[in-house]
């Protein structure tokens, strides 16, 4: 995802730069924001293999932060750095669904692996148990739905991605 200028031309671009066309994030976070047409995004990326490789790169890249239009480090930047998961920023909503996109490209085991990593490494039962601010229940709903093995990649729809639950039972 890349911003455009008012005249329709492409804006200068640095995928690690925060701000500008990206609210509290960068291009690595917003690249996956085609909730309504994941298959179209996969096709645009070059197919399943290239799509999966691009998701893999989010975790493999260094946690580089360029302040961009913010001019200083904001808490979302710090949270991403502290997580030590490359450019993956669980502490901010725009990328939280990305892990589930592995399943759309035929690799649900990677979805399972990274969900477990995020749940085990970034959440705990202390007063600081979320990897960022709660933002209208975003952190807790991601955790609960992921623990139950369901997730709505496209908000506002009744379509859910189903995976193996991480919990053996739940009362709803």
PLM feature spans:
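Acidic, glycine-enriched catalytic cores built around paired aspartates
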Residues: 127-131
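A glycine- and small/hydrophobic-rich beta-loop-beta segment
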Residues: 69-72, 97, 108-121
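Structural helix-adjacent loops and short alpha-helical linkers that scaffold large soluble proteins
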Residues: 42-53, 103-115, 155
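Catalytic cores of secreted or luminal carbohydrate-active enzymes
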Residues: 107-118, 135-160
């Amino acid at each position: 995802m890349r911003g455009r200028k008012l005249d329709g031309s492409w804006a200068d671009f640095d995928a690690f730069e925060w701000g500008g066309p990206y609210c509290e994030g960068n291009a690595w976070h917003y690249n996956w924001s085609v909730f309504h047409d994941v298959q179209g995004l996969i096709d645009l990326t070059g197919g399943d293999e290239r799509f999966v490789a691009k998701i893999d790169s989010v975790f493999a890249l260094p946690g580089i932060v360029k302040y961009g239009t913010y001019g200083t480090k904001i808490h979302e930047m710090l949270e991403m750095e502290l997580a030590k998961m490359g450019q993956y920023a669980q502490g901010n909503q725009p990328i939280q669904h990305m892990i589930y996109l592995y399943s759309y490209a035929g690799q649900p085991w990677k979805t399972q692996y990274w969900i477990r990593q995020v749940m085990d490494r970034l959440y705990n039962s202390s007063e600081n148990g979320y990897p960022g601010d709660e933002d209208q229940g975003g952190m807790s709903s991601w955790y609960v739905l992921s623990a139950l093995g369901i997730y709505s990649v496209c908000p506002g729809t009744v379509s859910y991605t189903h995976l193996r639950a991480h919990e053996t039972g739940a009362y709803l």
